[in-house]
């Protein structure tokens, strides 16, 4: 009878339960139940919780293990067994759930002679917002600010305060220029002169050239000529005045008034040909100096060598001369002996 009950209880443990589903909001706790029968309390019943289905994983991704009395392995503090383990209550409590906790879970109890397992499917949803989302208020078309193109870019040049930009110099003639020449005629001579007036209307144009200018002032006077033709000199007084980097042109409406004209400075033009000729002349001078040095050095060396040759040739010539004298004396003696050996030479001749 007892064996029959054990057999029936084993069959009941082998029957798998239906897969239950649980849904929880993120941040809350959830409990997955797992309770097995403790008919035989004398033997230990190890249990485990893991991720995945029981038939395929068998607690390979273990979360927690027990030996039937206490927890022997715990993957994280979020996984708790709050039931009475010795009474067969190994329900799993997951605290502070997150979205990644979603998925299948498996509980296995290793009962002697049989296995008990149960599968669960957990779904963790994201936390719902407490207030509805606010939609942005569309007040019309978006306003796009485009940069205003005012034409060419404005370049600010630094103002040089060292030199004045405008200088006005009024031309003032204090006394009229009058030249009188005495004449020896009976008739009266009348000389009419007109003084130089200061210009009433002055137009001043200013500019900033890089070089100083030369201002020539022409002052002309008219003289009325009478029969005796007394001439009045027309004086031209050029004035060379340095300017402060300004061209001043003064004109007047009166033709008899003084006219001051500004002669624009002529820019110095660089002549590249002149520099080329100067360079060629300098190069030719260097070559000539080098050739002279070589010639002088060679002449001194040759002169030194020729002096040593003369010094060697002098004793040689003396030795040769002495040898020639010895040979001549020997020849003379031979001739004398020949004459003595032939006493009949004079008679036969």
Curated annotation (Swiss-Prot):
Q: Name one GO molecular function term.
A: phosphatidylserine binding
GO cellular component terms attached to this protein's record: cell surface; plasma membrane
Q: Which residues lie on this side of the membrane: Extracellular?
A: 21-275
Disulphide bridges in this chain?
Answer: 34-107, 48-59, 54-106
Residue ranges crossing the lipid bilayer per the database entry: 276-296
Q: What else is known?
A: Human appears to lack the Timd2 gene.
> Which spans of this chain does the record mark as coiled coil?
none
What's the family? Belongs to the immunoglobulin superfamily. TIM family.
PROSITE patterns listed in its UniProt record: IG_LIKE
User: What is this protein for, i.e. what is its function?
Assistant: Probable receptor for SEMA4A involved in the regulation of T-cell function. The interaction with SEMA4A enhances T-cell activation.
Put simply, this protein is called T-cell immunoglobulin and mucin domain-containing protein 2
Q: Where is the composition biased (Low complexity)?
A: 136-215
User: Where is region (Disordered) located?
Assistant: 128-271
Indicate the secretion signal residues. Answer: 1-20
**Glycosylation: which residues?**
84, 89
Annotated Ig-like V-type domain ranges read: 22-123
- Keywords associated with the record: Cell membrane, Disulfide bond, Glycoprotein, Immunoglobulin domain, Membrane, Receptor, Signal, Transmembrane, Transmembrane helix
Q: How does it sit in the membrane?
A: Single-pass type I membrane protein
Subunit notes for this chain? Homodimer.
The record's SMART domains line, in alphabetical order, gives: IG
- What's the source species for this entry? Rattus norvegicus (Rat)
Q: Name one GO biological process term.
A: positive regulation of mast cell activation
Subcellular localization, per the record?
A: Cell membrane
Taken from the record's topology, the Cytoplasmic segments are 297-349
Q: Where is the composition biased (Polar residues)?
A: 222-260
């Amino acid at each position: 009878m007892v064996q029959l009950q054990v057999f029936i209880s084993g069959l009941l443990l082998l029957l798998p339960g239906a897969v239950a589903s649980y849904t929880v909001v993120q941040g809350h706790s959830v409990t997955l139940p797992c309770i097995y029968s403790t008919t035989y309390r004398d033997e230990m019943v190890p249990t485990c919780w893991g991720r995945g289905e029981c038939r395929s994983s068998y607690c390979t991704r273990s979360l927690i293990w027990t030996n039937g009395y206490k927890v022997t392995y715990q993957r994280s503090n979020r996984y708790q067994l709050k039931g009475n383990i010795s009474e067969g209550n190994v329900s799993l409590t997951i605290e502070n759930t997150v979205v990644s906790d979603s998925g299948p879970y498996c509980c296995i109890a290793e009962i002697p002679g049989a296995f008990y397992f149960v599968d669960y499917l957990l779904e963790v949803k994201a936390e719902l917002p407490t207030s509805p989302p606010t939609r942005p208020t569309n007040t019309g078309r978006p306003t796009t600010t485009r940069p205003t193109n005012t034409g060419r870019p404005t370049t600010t040049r630094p103002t040089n305060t060292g030199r004045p930009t405008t200088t006005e110099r009024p031309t003032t003639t204090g006394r009229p220029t009058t030249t009188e020449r005495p004449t020896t005629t009976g008739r009266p001579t009348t000389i009419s002169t007109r003084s130089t007036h200061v210009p009433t209307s002055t137009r001043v144009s200013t500019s900033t050239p890089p070089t100083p200018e030369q201002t020539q002032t022409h002052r002309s006077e008219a003289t009325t000529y009478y029969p005796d033709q007394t001439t009045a000199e027309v004086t031209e007084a050029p004035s060379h005045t340095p300017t402060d980097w300004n061209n001043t042109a003064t004109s007047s409406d009166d033709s008899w008034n003084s006219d001051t004209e500004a002669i624009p400075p002529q820019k110095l033009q660089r002549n590249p040909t002149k520099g080329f000729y100067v360079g060629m002349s300098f190069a030719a001078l260097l070559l000539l100096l080098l050739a002279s040095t070589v010639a002088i050095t060679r002449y001194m060396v040759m002169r030194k060598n020729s002096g040593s040759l003369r010094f060697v040739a002098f004793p040689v010539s003396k030795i040769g001369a002495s040898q020639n004298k010895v040979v001549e004396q020997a020849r003379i003696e031979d001739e004398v002996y020949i004459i003595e050996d032939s006493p009949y030479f004079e008679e036969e001749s």
